[in-house]
Swiss-Prot record:
Activity regulation info: Inhibited by both FK506 and rapamycin.
Record-listed E.C. numbers: 5.2.1.8
Subcellular location field: Endoplasmic reticulum
Function comment: PPIases accelerate the folding of proteins. It catalyzes the cis-trans isomerization of proline imidic peptide bonds in oligopeptides.
Phylogenetic lineage: Eukaryota, Fungi, Dikarya, Ascomycota, Saccharomycotina
TM stretches of this protein: none
Name of the featured protein: FK506-binding protein 2
Catalytic activity: [protein]-peptidylproline (omega=180) = [protein]-peptidylproline (omega=0)
UniProt entry keywords in alphabetical sequence: Endoplasmic reticulum, Isomerase, Rotamase, Signal
Organism per entry: Yarrowia lipolytica (strain CLIB 122 / E 150) (Yeast)
Signal peptide: 1-20
A cellular component annotation (GO) from this entry: endoplasmic reticulum
Domain PPIase FKBP-type: 48-136
Length: 144
């Protein structure tokens, strides 16, 4: 009887751990590392803007897998168009030039079950330190 109780408790702990992990990684987490005052922020990144972003990408264990900072060349892309992982499209939205954010991106908003080559394993949560370098728009901006 004692073995059955131990097995039931162990099974319940396992199930609780699985649900806690899934819940923890379900949403994009955005941390502000450097905030820009409203007086200095004359423009926020919006869907359709072409943005330039410096970043350092890490796995949860701290392994750096990519860094535009090390290359000295920010990445440039149209925001909200799916040209980057969904966690980036969501996490850069609303940033001001000069603002820095820490984006903790769960697998389903990153590279998911397939990962990315030999660099990013399947089901990886990614951590990016980002800085918005510039915003370029042609006067034709979509609403948030």
């Amino acid at each position: 009887m004692a073995r059955i109780i131990v097995l039931i408790v162990a099974f319940m702990a396992l199930i609780a751990g699985v649900f806690a992990t899934e819940e923890k990684l379900a949403k994009l987490q955005i941390g502000i590392l450097k905030k820009i005052s409203p007086e200095e922020c004359t423009q926020k990144a919006r869907k359709g803007d072409t943005v330039s972003v410096h970043y350092t990408g890490k796995l949860e264990d701290g392994t750096v897998f990519d860094s535009s900072v090390e290359r000295g060349q920010p990445i440039q892309f149209p925001l909200g168009t799916g040209r980057v992982i969904p966690g980036w499209d969501q996490g850069i939205l609303g940033m001001c030039v000069g603002e820095k954010r820490k984006l903790t991106i769960p697998p389903h908003l990153a590279y998911g079950k397939q990962g990315a080559g030999r660099v990013i394993p399947p089901d990886s949560t990614l951590i990016f330190t980002t800085e918005l370098v510039s915003i370029d728009n042609d006067g034709d901006r979509d609403e948030l």
